[in-house]
Amino acid sequence: MCNHDHPLFQKKEKESKDERTVHDQEHLLWNRRSFIQALGLVGGGSMMLGSHTVSATKPSPLSVALAESENDHILVIIRLEGGNDGLNTIVPVYDYASYANLRPTIRHQQSDLLNLNADFAIPNYMNALESVWGDGNMKVVHGVGYPQQNLSHFRSTDIWASTADTYEEPTGWWGRYFEDLYPDYLINPPEIPPAVQIGNVGNLIFDGNNNNYAFTVANLEQLQNVAENGTLHDVVNIPDCVYGDKLLFMRATANTTFLYAETIHDAYTAASNNADYGEGDLGQQLSAVARLIKGGLGTKVYMVSLGSFDTHANQPERHQELLQDLSNSIKAFYEDLAVSGMDDKVLGMTISEFGRRPYENGSDGTDHGAASPVMLFGAGLNGSGFVGEHPDINEWDANDNLIPTNDFRDVYNSVLTNWFCLDPSVINTILLNQSYEILDLGIECQTLSTNDFSNVNRFSHVPVYKNNTVYLEMNVPSAGRGTIVLYDLVGREIGTIANQLFFEGRHSIDIKEAIGKRLSFGQYIYRISLGGQHYSKSLMIK
């Protein structure tokens, strides 16, 4: 993590050149996931499997039933990248003296504040949100964070994305949901992208164990290119050599960009904007999201980002520019949606990897901290207000950070339960089987599932590992002829596991024995065709 976040450095008012260099180096670190996402090549939806060109087809019956049990609500996650300073966003005027004492230089003057109620205010340059609040379309959850706050940008971002704060979990909370919803996603992807992500390079929020479930572009320009032209990169002219195989692998495992290009294009061109978004970065992203929503794309989750919240120095000017962009963009976004009567169907939610320290540093800024507010927007909130207790700005933890009063996973749990009306068992999977509170956000689930799951195809399949042998175990609900084919990750056919009549009941197949030849160690994909449906999953040969 950044050196200046260590307790040994927390009292220094100025950072040394070496310390700042370490901080800058951390921001320049890229991993393989970041590199691929920066190219706009993200996702795992479409690939060549042998002679089969996999394209957008209808989801499995179970996926359809699960999808139909949901409502028509949409979530737009707005990531404030870098760690937003909550005290200068939602100002605690109930204890203005303490606030001003901690921040003699960067504080907001009382004359420059717009009161939301008697206790809390926003800076006057966020005045675009004054009407949003007044119309009952804004909630603020106080003091959001988690225990033993990690002060590294990258680790804390992963914690917010994965929900795991005590170990490194490789999947994201939305990735786990979509992995459960689309178990055969590799070969039978849904007709619409499960999620759309602009920027946030390297974020694992939509990562499953084997796929990224978001249509992801590195920036707005790439999204506009796809939306307006229907294409992004060439996937046909790939050389027939080792390099070509590697290039094909990277593009094949990231081909949702191409898979959904036409769908994105159709939705984008079917609608137009009916609000002035200005020239801000976030505003332009949200204007594109609004067109996709109004154009009937059908995607349930979007994520956009606004960067540069890491305000170690010269915070007043930088923070003002960012919060103005946020405020103006939110107002325009919901004005735009209201024209189509969709402002009550879309919930906006800000997240940030951490807050800032309660006191200013010696560079007209603030250093990495802990608790910070989460803001929610939309007519579906049924009134504006504050949720939970505000942290005591005079009571800090051992690292001089505000003590969180609400867990960020409580916010997630509340949205999943009362906005998307998901079944508790599904939410348990999403939140790694941990229990969290449900906050009073003003939203209440009004949708009950009316689907009869007794008629859903109960076919199941799973690889089982026993004594250095890999078995494919299946439960077949009704007899039928089926084929099972094994592929490597590039999509080359390795061999046929089975081509036979499967009787009703349980089946266990020894993969190595069925293939009849030596298999190299590594990951493979099997594809089952049975009863007019296709299923796939990865397995490991050890």
Provide a role label for each language-model segment.
Residues 1-30, 477, 515:
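N-terminal secretory signal peptides
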Residues 5-7, 92-98, 107-127, 311-447:
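Feature marks hydrolase-like catalytic cores characterized by long aromatic- and Gly/Pro-rich stretches
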Residues 28, 34-59:
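N-terminal export signals
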Residues 49-87, 95, 455, 493:
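C-terminal segment of N-terminal export signals and the immediately downstream linker at the start
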Residues 119-227:
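Extracytoplasmic mature domains of secreted/periplasmic and thylakoid-lumen proteins
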Residues 238-332, 336:
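Anion-binding catalytic surfaces of enzymes that hydrolyze or transfer phosphate/sulfate esters
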Residues 443-469, 475-477:
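Residue-level detector of functionally pivotal "anchor" positions at catalytic/ligand-binding pockets or at interdomain
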Residues 501-504, 512-513, 517-542:
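C-terminal tail/sorting-segment detector
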